[in-house]
Amino acid sequence: MASVATEQTGLTRVAVSRRIKKLADSGYLQRHGTGTRQTYSLGDKRFWLGLQQRESILQRGGEMAVWEQRLAPLLTDLKPNVKSLVNTAFTEMLNNALDHSNGLQVLMGMHLEGGQLQMVVADDGEGIFCKIAESAHLFDERLAILELAKGKFTTAAQGHSGMGIFVSSRMMDGFAIESCGLRFDPNEASTPLARFDWIDVNAALKPSQVQ
């Protein structure tokens, strides 16, 4: 594993070995064997974070390409029904950012720990509530939350039904959208979304970090 990582990253073998040890000690990798014959597999914890130009994602295959290349390999041991739900929710949210945000960059992330899987899709676009309010001629962005909750509104009628966010918000144990200074969490009264302590979205969306 160290040899492959060294070749792909350009880091020294010592640097790679240190990182592998840190990942194993932290639970992101699981060791097998001892000494120089050690092998590794995915640990109980999983993590991925990517920041890319929106146009670049579209040119490379869109949301399904990101899923197949980045998330699916980290979630191979999920139950098929759970993996299907995760796939739908992630690709729907990423598709929304790609097709509707008009932003330059998209931040995507996943963290799995203690049986709890969290995902993030964020962009630097105009904001979903602001866009809905403008498109529907609403005088207050808060009314956009009501339109969104109905699951029948889309700002791009050609090819979109408006059901993606509606369905995703109900298939997940927790779901929230933050935009234009507002927050939509359909389960906030009963089971509010857990904190995402593993990511700082605002810091991660800095343009200088785009790849």
Question: Can you describe what each PLM-predicted range is?
Answer:
Residues 92, 97:
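Catalytic glutamate of the conserved HExxH
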Residues 30, 35-52, 98-211:
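Conserved beta-strand-loop-beta-strand hairpin that lines the nucleotide-binding pocket
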